[in-house]
Every structure is written in structure tokens, then in C-alpha cells.
Regions:
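N-terminal periplasmic accessory domains that precede
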Residues: 94-101, 143-146, 184-185, 199, ...
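Outer-membrane beta-barrel signature, preferentially recognizing the C-terminal barrel domain
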Residues: 470-476, 546-594, 599, 618-630, ...
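Outer membrane beta-barrel strand-and-loop segments of large Gram-negative receptors
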Residues: 424-428, 468-470, 475, 574, ...
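Short acidic/polar hinge/loop motifs at secondary-structure boundaries
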Residues: 65, 176-203
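Surface-exposed extracellular loop regions of Gram-negative outer-membrane beta-barrel proteins
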Residues: 219-236, 280-287, 296-297, 305-312, 397, 504-506, 534-580, 595-613, ...
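Short, acidic, small-residue-rich periplasmic hinge/interaction motif at the N-terminus
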Residues: 33, 41-43, 77-81, 91, ...
Length: 774
């Protein structure tokens, strides 16, 4: 492996081209501010033949490398501005083009309608950007369903995995969500509200150190003048054979969505609201071998879900130096679920049925969340020196009531009631100081405080059981400071950073302290980028990360899933630390090839299984060292002018080594994941889209999960001058997204199969109204 890395580094970083001349320049607007995204064309003077093209960076910079001697013309285009031209001559020397100042085009500003289409994938120095907006297969979906279509992301049992790693931090508009039930938030968020998703596999010092990787979901925000908005409605139904698929009804969804934006002068206001009604199911089978007997279980869990979410805010552009913002968002979620469990105890040697019993679990869930933010951005001058201050406050309330009735030789009645309020506040400060256009220093600090109460009342035959009831109070205060230094030298760019975090965590159960921690940790990071040519670039990354145990994992209470299964928290688990390395090669800012290596210590096994007589329970444990290696190869699927898309492969190696239950658990496994998305546009206004993924069997802690996949197809038509859009989606056409697997370790022998409501058809309509022009 060391030889491979050495050869790969040498072959990529020391590729050089024969020509040496470089053309550089910078683009400013009429207020002397750097312009990002201006189209810069390098043309031959004699016949205007296109030589190369580029987009100006965030600092307004552009460059062309390896240019032959000759006479050229640099043309700069930007929507709403007049074209600029500069004539230059290259004669074996580097050329610095005079700064280009764009002049507004008053005529075009009133006539241009924004119709540009972004590529689905964009590779940037520190992240992969997935442009969800405009995707046909995303129409009518939830955010959780959209994540399943993102390259390298898998969602298993509502748990998000990225490149084989399950320690993933989900953020919404850069805001943390670690104290909310993020799977429920994403499961009720309309995809119509999402602009793009950022995958940050090796976050820098500016980001929280928590989590092995970051998935940042960015909400749409319109900056057009006047009043504009979008209204949409999505409906869908499941496609199942009642007898064959084990369901007793049809399943459907309804999801209306409305967003409005108004910008006049210095004030921009916006808001959105969505409603989501869905009924769905989960069907599972378990086969447990315990001594000489087998327990065969089936669980059928139909449920009805209702939720609504809202978002409102305003940005005030007070002057050229100060911008103030405020917003509030929230959601309400309710679910009624009735799980029917049937268990047979069978003699393993003869197959004779020894006993049969059934369990009915009626669960009512209610979740409420409200979050508010105020922010201020101050630009000290036009060089990019700025200060950002953010304050966030949110509350989250979970109520869960479960009635569990088991019918065997006699009938038992159990009841679990959970009351779980959460309060969370964050104050963050970020400062950026560019010394010049090639050198920049960033620094900042952050403090957060979470106060959580988890109150559980357990009753048996309507009598409170004090031994199983608990009141777990938890608080977590995280303080952080960071600094990051960025430098560009010719075709090289490096970023190095250091983040220091203090964690103060306290927990007590029924007035007894079970947790009291106070510690500091350092998290270095480094990025090295080289632009090999006008098409190829390479990036080498390193970061240290931490995955802190959640308050649910540290809560020592017992939660019964059925009469034979329960889970229990562990207040003694420690944070896990990981070191992550990644080397990637990009072509025209598209992800092409990468290799990454991750080493994690004190790995938290979230569901470490244990056998207690006929009962099986799981608990979080620090068990293992974990190695993860990922080779990734992506490629475009562009054929002519009508077919476009991408395909990709990931080869993932997971290795766990742990001492558990008196024995050594030492297992490793390779698996292959493939994903694709292809669009066919036979004529303007029509789009046919095919997407999906496939993965071979993989290892997740003690569980070996069998192969699974997904195939989706969508038809989309735009009309009414591109303001209206209708989409018809067929999801999981082959009904192949089924979770199957097994746990075999010492006296634990369990096989399972799980089916969710994934095969469905959806019809979505959206209409953009108001001013769609700049």
C-alpha cells in the first residue's frame, strides 16, 4: 500500500506540460468588488478561434496555463454586464492582463431570464457539490430519498453512510443538527426546497470536528428583484402485490409546497411552507438460533405520518459593508404506527413448533422543532476582509408513547412513555483577512450549549416499574477556536489549519451522576492542490475528526422493541478519533479519480449485540480499530448533444478488529458500489432521466449486509415559457432495495430481511411565478 501511494503521488504531482507561459487576470464589478463566475474566453486574434475558457474564482481571479506563443484576445462575459475585450501577446513570458472592470448593461438587465443549467456534479477543492435543483428523479421526493441518489451515499435503516463510513454529520444551511432526529427531519423535508447538497469528506479547520464527513443541505434562496416564488404539488402511491409483498393495503403520499421571495431595494424577504402526508410500511423477518432452538419472527409495521415545515427570513443590505439577516424555521411531525409481531419457537433438529406468541406494539410519536438565527456580515474593504457573526437557538420536543401487548400462554401489558425536550444554542464568529490575492488567513471561534432531558416511564400491567423507568438529564458544552492559512504559488495552492475543541459533558440519572467529562482535543487539517493543466487538477487532503457519542447512546435506559429484543444506552462510551487522507484527480472540475484512507480508534459500535437467555439486546460499545479504504472512479456519460450524465464506481474496504465477549473479532471485506444518472433530451422541454445504484455485500460492524440496488426512471416536461414543470417518477422499479443480512458471532446467530415502502410512482407539478429576471 505504501508503494502504491508513493507511485500514485509521483505520477500525478509531477506531470508537466511542455509549454510554460501563463496568462492571469482579475475581474471586478462597478463597485470594485471581485466577480465570481464570469465567463473568460481566450481567443485567437486572427480568427476568434476559441483556445480555452474558464470561470473567475471567488476572488475574481482567472488563469490559462501552458499557452503557446502568439497573439490572443481575452473576452469576459457576465450576465447583466457589457462584454470586455483585452488584446495580449505571449512571447515565452507570463502575461498579467490588466484588471477588468465590468460595466452594467442597463438594456440586458431588463431582458435576461435566468435559464442556465448547472452540471449535476461539481468537484471543488474541499467538497463535491451535487446540484439537486432541476433533477427529474428528485421531483416529489423527500430529502432522505434524494440522499439515496447522491453518489457514494447509502441510506440503510434511515442511517446515512458516505463511502462506507457511518459517522456522518448532517447540516442544513451550514447549521448543525446533532441533537434532533435528523432522519425524521430529512424524511419529511420536500426536495422542492433543496438547491444543492455538499459532500465534504475531509472538512477543514473552519468546520466542527464532529463526524467523519459532512453532508450539507443548502435550501433554495432567490435573489431576483421583485416578487417571485414557486408552488408545487406531488402525489404518489406504492406499487405492491398484497399477497406476494406481505402488505395489506395501498400506500400513498401527498406533498404540497409553496415558497415566496420579495426583493426591493436593500431588503430581501423570503418564506416557504410545506405539508407532507404519507403512509408507509416496514416488513421484517428475523431468524434467531439460540442453543437448540430457533425463533422465527415477522414484523409488519404500517404507519401514517403527517408533517408540516416552514421557513421565513429577511436579509438587509444596509450598505456596501454591512448585511444583516434573520430567519426562523420549524417543523411538526406526528406518526401513528401499529406493529404486528408473530414469533414461533422451533426445535432446530426436528422443526417441531414448541410455542407461538404474538405482540402488538401501538406507537404514537410527536416531534416539534423551531430554530431561529440572526447574523451579521461586515466587509471592512473591497479586498475580501470580512467578519461574520451568527447566533442560533433551537428547541426540539419528542413525545413517544408505546403500548406493547404480548399474547402467549397469558397476556402481558407493557407501556413506554418518553418525554424528551432539547434546547440548543450556538454563537459563532468567523474572520477572514487576505494579505493579497494569493494569501489569506481565516480564524474564528464557536461556543455551543445543549440541555437535554430524557424522561422515561415504564409500566407493566399499568403499574410503574421503577427499575426500568428513568429521568436522564444531559448537558453538553463545546467551545472551539480555529485558524486556517491559505497560500497560492503559481499552479500550487495549500491550506493548513488547526482547530482546538473543549468538550464539557455531564449526565445524571435519577439524581445520580453517571457522566462527567471535561477535555480538550486538537484537530489539524491540510489541503494541497496542484493545477496540472487547464483540464486536470489534483488535491491531497488530510484531517483529524472526532465522533462523540450522542446523548441517546449515553442514556442508560432500556427500550423494548418487542418481547425478545431491547436496546440500552451506555454512559461509559468514549469519543472515537479518526485520521482521514484523500488524494483526488479532477477533470474540468468534475470528480474523476480518488483514493482515500481512514483509520479510526475506539470505534463506537452502535449496536453491539448480546444474548441474555432468550433475549437479544444491543448497546453502544467502544470496541475496535477500524480501517476504511476507498477507490473511486467517476466518468461522464455524454453522448452527442442530447444525452448527458455521469457514472461512477467505488471499491470500499472495511476492516474491524475488536476484543468482544472474550474473543477477537477480526473481519474485513471489500465491496463494490456503482451509481449512475443519465438524461436524454430529445427536444426542448422534454427530459427522460434514468438513475440508480448497486452495491455488493458489505460489512457494517457485526452485520454482513447482502447486495442491494435501486433503479429509477423519470419523465419531465417543461412548458408555459419554462415556468411550469410536470414530472412522472418510477422509483425502485425492480423492488431491489431490500435490506438482508446476518450476524454470526459466538453464541449470536441472527439472520434478517427488511422491506420498506421504496417502490412507488409519483407525479409532481411545479410552477414558478412572478419576476424570474435579474
Amino acid at each position: 500500500m505504501k508503494i502504491f501511494f508513493t507511485l500514485l503521488l509521483c505520477s500525478i504531482f509531477f506531470i508537466t506540460a511542455s509549454a510554460q507561459s501563463t496568462i492571469k487576470g482579475k475581474v471586478f464589478d462597478e463597485k470594485q468588488k471581485p466577480v465570481k463566475g464570469a465567463a473568460v474566453l481566450l481567443l485567437q486574434q486572427k480568427d476568434s478561434t476559441l483556445v480555452l475558457s474558464a470561470l473567475s474564482s471567488e476572488n475574481g481571479d482567472y488563469s490559462f496555463n501552458n499557452i503557446k506563443n502568439g497573439n490572443y484576445r481575452v473576452m469576459i462575459n457576465m450576465l447583466g454586464y457589457k462584454k470586455l475585450n483585452n488584446k495580449i501577446t505571449v512571447a515565452g513570458n507570463n502575461v498579467q492582463v490588466p484588471d477588468s472592470k465590468l460595466v452594467p448593461d442597463a438594456v440586458s438587465l431588463g431582458e435576461v431570464t435566468v435559464t442556465s443549467t448547472k452540471p449535476f456534479l461539481e468537484q471543488r477543492a474541499d467538497k463535491l457539490v451535487v446540484n439537486v435543483e432541476g433533477s427529474a428523479t428528485a421531483a416529489g421526493s423527500t430529502a432522505l430519498e434524494v440522499l439515496q441518489k447522491v453518489p457514494g451515499v447509502m441510506v440503510v435503516n434511515d442511517q446515512v453512510k458516505l463511502a462506507g463510513k457511518s459517522s456522518v454529520t448532517i447540516m442544513i444551511d451550514g447549521k448543525p443538527s446533532q441533537y434532533t432526529d435528523i432522519s425524521q427531519v430529512l424524511g419529511t423535508m420536500s426536495a422542492a426546497n433543496i438547491e444543492k447538497i455538499e459532500l465534504i469528506t475531509n472538512p477543514g479547520a473552519k468546520y466542527d470536528a464532529s463526524g467523519g464527513a459532512i453532508i450539507n443541505i443548502l435550501i433554495k434562496k432567490n435573489a431576483n428583484l421583485g416578487t417571485n416564488g414557486t408552488a408545487s404539488l406531488a402525489v404518489g402511491t406504492g406499487l405492491y402485490t398484497k399477497g406476494k409483498d406481505g402488505v395489506d393495503r395501498n400506500y400513498y403520499r401527498v406533498s404540497p409546497f409553496l415558497s415566496v421571495n420579495h426583493r426591493k431595494g436593500k431588503l430581501n424577504t423570503y418564506g416557504s411552507i410545506s405539508f407532507f402526508h404519507r403512509n408507509q410500511f416496514q416488513y421484517s423477518e428475523f431468524d434467531r438460533a439460540i442453543t437448540t432452538n430457533r425463533f422465527l419472527q415477522t414484523n409488519y409495521s404500517p404507519n401514517d405520518r403527517n408533517s408540516y415545515s416552514y421557513r421565513a427570513g429577511a436579509d438587509l443590505y444596509a450598505d456596501n459593508k454591512n448585511t444583516f439577516g434573520i430567519f426562523v424555521r420549524g417543523f411538526n411531525f406526528t406518526m401513528d404506527e401499529n406493529t404486528i409481531n408473530t414469533t414461533q419457537q422451533i426445535k432446530a433438529s426436528t422443526g417441531a413448533v414448541l410455542s407461538t406468541f404474538s405482540t402488538l406494539n401501538n406507537t404514537n410519536v410527536k416531534r416539534d422543532n423551531i430554530a431561529a438565527n440572526i447574523n451579521w456580515k461586515h466587509n471592512f474593504d473591497t479586498t475580501g476582509k470580512d467578519l461574520n457573526i451568527d447566533f442560533d437557538y433551537s428547541t426540539f420536543q419528542l413525545n413517544n408513547n408505546s403500548d406493547i401487548v404480548t399474547q402467549a400462554a397469558s397476556t402481558s401489558y407493557l407501556n413506554q412513555y418518553v418525554n424528551n425536550p432539547v434546547k440548543f444554542g450556538v454563537l459563532k464568529l468567523d474572520y477572514s483577512y487576505p494579505f493579497n490575492k494569493n494569501t489569506k488567513l481565516e480564524m474564528g471561534g464557536k461556543t455551543s450549549l445543549a440541555i437535554i432531558d430524557n424522561y422515561l416511564v415504564f409500566k407493566k400491567s399499568n403499574v410503574v416499574d421503577p427499575s426500568r423507568s428513568t429521568d436522564f438529564e444531559y448537558s453538553e458544552n463545546i467551545n472551539a477556536v480555529y485558524a486556517s492559512f491559505q497560500k497560492k504559488i503559481d499552479n500550487w495552492e495549500f491550506i493548513t489549519g488547526l482547530r482546538a475543541e473543549q468538550t464539557i459533558a455531564k449526565g445524571k440519572s435519577i439524581s445520580v451522576d453517571v457522566l462527567n467529562r471535561n477535555y480538550w482535543q486538537l484537530f489539524p487539517s491540510a489541503f494541497l492542490t496542484r493545477k496540472i493543466s487547464n483540464h486536470f487538477s489534483t488535491v491531497l487532503q488530510y484531517s483529524r475528526r472526532v465522533n462523540r457519542p450522542s446523548y441517546q447512546q449515553q442514556n442508560p435506559f432500556i427500550q423494548y422493541l418487542d418481547s425478545l429484543t431491547y436496546t440500552r444506552g451506555n454512559p461509559l462510551i468514549r469519543p472515537e478519533l479518526s485520521d482521514a487522507y484523500k488524494l483526488s484527480l479532477t477533470y474540468d472540475n468534475q470528480p474523476f479519480f480518488s483514493v482515500s484512507y481512514n483509520k479510526t480508534h475506539d470505534v463506537i459500535f452502535n449496536d453491539a449485540p448480546k444474548q441474555e437467555g432468550n433475549l437479544t439486546y444491543t448497546t453502544p460499545e467502544n470496541l475496535a480499530a477500524f480501517e476504511n479504504i476507498v477507490f473511486e472512479l467517476n466518468f461522464p456519460l455524454d453522448i452527442g448533444k442530447k444525452i448527458s450524465g455521469y457514472g461512477g464506481n467505488q471499491f470500499i474496504y472495511n476492516h474491524y478488529k475488536a476484543d468482544y465477549l472474550g474473543s477477537l473479532y477480526n473481519r474485513s471485506k471489500w465491496n463494490w458500489q456503482a451509481y449512475w444518472q443519465v438524461s436524454y433530451k430529445p427536444k426542448p422541454g422534454w427530459n427522460f432521466e434514468l438513475s440508480g445504484f448497486y452495491t455488493t455485500s458489505l460489512l457494517e460492524e457485526f452485520i454482513e449486509i447482502q447486495e442491494l440496488g435501486n433503479l429509477n426512471f423519470a419523465i419531465q416536461k417543461t412548458f408555459m415559457d419554462k415556468k411550469a414543470k410536470i414530472s412522472l417518477n418510477f422509483n425502485d422499479i425492480l423492488f431491489s432495495q431490500k435490506n438482508r443480512g446476518a450476524i454470526v458471532y459466538q453464541d449470536i446467530n441472527l439472520a434478517f430481511r427488511q422491506v420498506n415502502e421504496t417502490r412507488n410512482v409519483r407525479l409532481a407539478f411545479s410552477y414558478s411565478f412572478g419576476n424570474q429576471k435579474l
